């Protein structure tokens, strides 16, 4: 499968056409960003780690019946995915209080939630990806009510699969962000990536942060903690 025309370049990935009209090539970059792009840095090896981790996690999800756009890992920094139209909603699943939730509801970071919370954010960099409700989604016509219901159910199902996968390697899944898209038949599929860029991951014993908070909060070497996650998940 050969890399064709550049379709889109985001903060962390580039998207290219291939000779197959419904298959695209994703290339992971070494760029690290935080605070809606206000903090930026190039970190050698980050793209390789995120590609490997995402490929591994999507394979594990598919093995547990979770459909996604993922086809296969193509190289160290590239993977093939099914073409989807991204739904402009960022879906956040929270198991433990951290980040913006701690500020918003006044609970201490690290407080377990009695059940997972699913939140929706409008995927719009210029607006700062604001928190939205299902009513906003309806008014803005971002997705149908059936799609929102499917996204909600899929997000919880993904959480149910991922939590024990991480727990088995002594990592706590604090929260994570998902994106979904519509395929050529209109089916809603998990898309984008699942990596330490999009998850909060803590060592279950030491509470060491093993995710992009290391970059956000200047807590250490990003590639070192991403390598820990890859290794614990059984990757190389």
Curated annotation (Swiss-Prot):
InterPro entries found in the cross-reference section: SAICAR_synt/ADE2_N (IPR028923), SAICAR_synt_PurC (IPR033934), SAICAR_synth (IPR001636), SAICAR_synthetase (IPR050089), SAICAR_synthetase_CS (IPR018236)
Xref: Pfam families: SAICAR_synt
Enzyme nomenclature, EC number: 6.3.2.6
Reaction catalyzed: 5-amino-1-(5-phospho-D-ribosyl)imidazole-4-carboxylate + L-aspartate + ATP = (2S)-2-[5-amino-1-(5-phospho-beta-D-ribosyl)imidazole-4-carboxamido]succinate + ADP + phosphate + 2 H(+)
Pathway connected to this protein: Purine metabolism; IMP biosynthesis via de novo pathway; 5-amino-1-(5-phospho-D-ribosyl)imidazole-4-carboxamide from 5-amino-1-(5-phospho-D-ribosyl)imidazole-4-carboxylate: step 1/2
HAMAP family the UniProt entry points to: SAICAR_synth
Protein's name in the database: Phosphoribosylaminoimidazole-succinocarboxamide synthase
Organism: Lysinibacillus sphaericus (strain C3-41)
Gene expressing this chain: purC
């Amino acid at each position: 499968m050969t890399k064709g025309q550049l379709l889109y370049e985001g903060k962390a990935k580039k998207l290219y056409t291939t000779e197959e009209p419904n298959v695209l090539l994703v290339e992971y970059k070494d760029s690290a960003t935080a605070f809606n792009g206000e903090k930026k840095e190039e970190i050698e090896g980050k793209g390789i780690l995120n590609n490997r981790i995402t490929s591994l996690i999507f394979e594990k999800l598919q093995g547990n019946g979770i459909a996604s756009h993922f086809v296969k890992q193509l190289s160290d920094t590239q993977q093939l995915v099914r073409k989807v139209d991204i739904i402009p909603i960022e879906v956040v699943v929270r198991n433990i209080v951290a980040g913006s939730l701690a500020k918003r509801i006044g609970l201490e970071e690290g407080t377990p939630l009695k059940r997972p919370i699913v939140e929706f954010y409008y995927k719009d960099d210029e607006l700062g990806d604001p928190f939205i409700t299902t009513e906003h989604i309806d008014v803005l016509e971002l997705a149908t009510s059936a799609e929102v219901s499917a996204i909600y159910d899929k997000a919880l199902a993904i959480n149910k699969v991922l939590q024990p996968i991480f727990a088995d390697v002594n990592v706590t899944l604090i929260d994570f962000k998902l994106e979904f898209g519509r395929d050529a038949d209109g089916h809603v599929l998990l898309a984008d990536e699942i990596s330490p860029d999009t998850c909060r991951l803590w060592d279950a014993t030491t509470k060491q942060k093993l995710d992009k908070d290391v970059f956000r909060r200047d807590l250490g070497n990003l590639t070192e903690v991403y390598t820990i996650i890859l290794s614990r998940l059984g990757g190389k």
